[in-house]
């Protein structure tokens, strides 16, 4: 299956290029809106995800660190599940971070000149040039900061991509055809090994998302690794009985063939003494 990620700036040409690439190749075009909808299975609403990605206000630090992990894992699980359903073109930001180690994924960055994006803001928002410029600068700053917090990367770093295109020097049609042509090259074709790696990555993301979303569990330092369907789960739990609960939950996840758990039990004060200590 083919996977193309197209990262782009706000009010750029990313959506148009992605939709055209998908049309040329006959792939499914997906965006954050589709991913957010899929994420609802893990208990994250569209409003919550938008708040994490774009709100100006800062969460209390510990709460933000915890929610950052939850949202990143849920988002990765959703996009991996969609990739398992067939050929996809994903457009948005940080798409290249969803498939680490999957060699047949083609990662694209579209660089649209600021002046062109300002014109788009003016047209869509009904703003004059200076307010539009300020709006765009603020939006870019917020989104870049949040992506760095979520993935610990500078998403504009060109070394994270296979191909960088300057849309000031090409049309949407030409850019789309260039991407489509590159995607057909041998190095971006799936192999049995890369398909297995994608399956394992999807299982890992699903396991992490399900365990994190479960209200029955209290796991810290959670680590999950999948090898050909065999899942290894480790971390710190507050009661020994939770280890079997985790194993039972993981076994029900599609694609899991075997579960091995490696937990350290460290009871919390509330578990030891209750609320009336």
What are these regions (language model features)?
Residues 101, 112, 119-123, 139-140, ...:
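N-terminal targeting leaders
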Residues 66, 94-96, 170:
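Short glycine-rich anion-binding loops that position phosphate/pyrophosphate groups of nucleotides
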Residues 87-124:
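ATP-dependent NMP and nucleoside kinases share a basic, alpha-helical "lid"
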Residues 24-30:
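Post-Walker A helix-loop "phosphate-sensing" segment adjacent to the P-loop in P-loop NTPases
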Residues 1-3:
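Extreme N-terminal starter segment of soluble prokaryotic enzymes
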Residues 5-19:
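Glycine-rich phosphate-binding P-loop
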Residues 35-90, 127:
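ATP-dependent small-molecule kinase phosphotransfer cores
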């Amino acid at each position: 299956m083919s996977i193309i990620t197209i990262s782009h700036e706000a009010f750029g040409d990313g959506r148009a290029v992605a939709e055209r690439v998908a049309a040329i190749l006959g792939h499914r075009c997906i965006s954050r809106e589709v991913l957010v909808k899929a994420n609802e299975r893990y208990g994250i609403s569209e409003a919550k995800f938008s708040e994490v990605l774009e709100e100006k206000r800062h969460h209390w630090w510990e709460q933000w660190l915890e929610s950052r992990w939850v949202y990143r894992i849920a988002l990765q699980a959703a996009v991996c599940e969609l990739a398992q359903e067939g050929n996809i073109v994903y457009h948005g930001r940080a798409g290249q971070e969803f498939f680490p180690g999957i060699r047949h994924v083609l990662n694209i960055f579209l660089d649209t000149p600021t002046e062109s994006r300002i014109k788009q803001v003016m047209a869509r928002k009904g703003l004059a040039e200076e307010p539009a410029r300020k709006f765009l600068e603020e939006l870019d700053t917020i989104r870049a900061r949040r992506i760095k917090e979520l993935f610990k990367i500078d998403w504009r770093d060109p070394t994270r991509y296979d191909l960088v295109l300057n849309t000031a020097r090409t049309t949407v049609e030409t850019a789309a055809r260039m991407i489509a042509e590159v995607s057909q090259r041998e190095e971006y074709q799936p192999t049995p090994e890369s398909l297995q790696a994608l399956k394992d990555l999807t299982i890992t993301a699903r396991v992490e998302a399900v365990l994190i979303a479960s209200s029955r569990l209290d796991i810290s330092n959670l680590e999950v690794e999948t090898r050909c369907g065999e899942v290894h789960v480790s971390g710190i739990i507050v009661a020994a009985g939770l280890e079997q609960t985790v194993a039972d939950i993981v076994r029900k996840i599609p694609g899991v063939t075997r579960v091995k758990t490696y937990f350290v039990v460290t009871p919390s004060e509330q578990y030891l003494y209750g609320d009336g200590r």
